[in-house]
Swiss-Prot record:
Gene designation: HBE1
Location of Phosphoserine modifications: 14, 51
A GO term for molecular function: hemoglobin alpha binding
Keywords: Heme, Iron, Metal-binding, Oxygen transport, Phosphoprotein, Transport
UniProt cross-references to Pfam families, sorted A to Z: Globin
Gene Ontology biological process: hydrogen peroxide catabolic process
Keyword Metal-binding: yes
Residues annotated as binding heme b: 64, 93
Organism: Cebus albifrons
Quaternary data: Heterotetramer of two alpha chains and two epsilon chains in early embryonic hemoglobin Gower-2; two zeta chains and two epsilon chains in early embryonic hemoglobin Gower-1.
Residue ranges annotated for the Globin domain, each copy included: 3-147
Protein name: Hemoglobin subunit epsilon
Length: 147
C-alpha cells in the first residue's frame, strides 16, 4: 500500500479540482494511442485511428478518455485504498480485455505530460512527484489481478 503525505494529497487534489476531465481525458487517451500505437489494438471498434489527427479528433477516443479520467477521479477520492477501488477494473482488463498491465504505466506517464502541459509553472517538481507517485500506484492497482 502506498502512503500519501498530507502535502502530496493537497498537491494532487488542488490540481485535479481545476482539471477539465473531458478535455484532458480525450487528450491523454489520444496521446497514448499516437505515441504507443500498439495500444490501438484494444480499441478496434473505435473506427478511424489511422493518423494522429484522426485519433485526436475521434469522438470515441474522447468519450473513452473521459471515462478513463473519471475513474481516475475515484483514485483521488480513495488514495488510501487504491487496490480495492480498482479491483473490478483490474479484473475486467485482465480477464476479459487481456490488456498488458504495462499500458497502465504508459497511460499514467502520458497523464503526467498532460498535466504539465495544462498547468505549466503550477506543475512544480513537488507536484509532479506527487502525481507520479499516484499514477504509479494506480497502475499497480490496475495490474493487481495479473499477479
Amino acid at each position: 500500500m502506498v502512503h500519501f503525505t498530507a502535502d502530496e494529497k493537497v498537491a494532487i487534489t488542488s490540481l485535479w479540482s481545476k482539471m477539465n476531465v473531458e478535455e484532458a481525458g480525450g487528450e491523454a487517451l489520444g496521446r497514448l494511442l499516437v505515441v504507443y500505437p500498439w495500444t490501438q489494438r484494444f480499441f478496434d471498434n473505435f473506427g478511424n485511428l489511422s493518423s494522429p489527427s484522426a485519433i485526436l479528433g475521434n469522438p470515441k477516443v474522447k468519450a473513452h478518455g473521459k471515462k478513463v479520467l473519471t475513474s481516475f477521479g475515484d483514485a483521488i477520492k480513495n488514495m488510501d485504498n487504491l487496490k480495492t477501488t480498482f479491483a473490478k477494473l483490474s479484473e475486467l482488463h485482465c480477464d476479459k480485455l487481456h490488456v498488458d498491465p504495462e499500458n497502465f504505466r504508459l497511460l499514467g506517464n502520458v497523464m503526467v505530460i498532460i498535466l504539465a502541459t495544462h498547468f505549466g509553472k503550477e506543475f512544480t517538481p513537488e507536484v509532479q512527484a506527487a502525481w507520479q507517485k499516484l499514477v504509479s500506484a494506480v497502475a499497480i492497482a490496475l495490474g493487481h489481478k495479473y499477479h
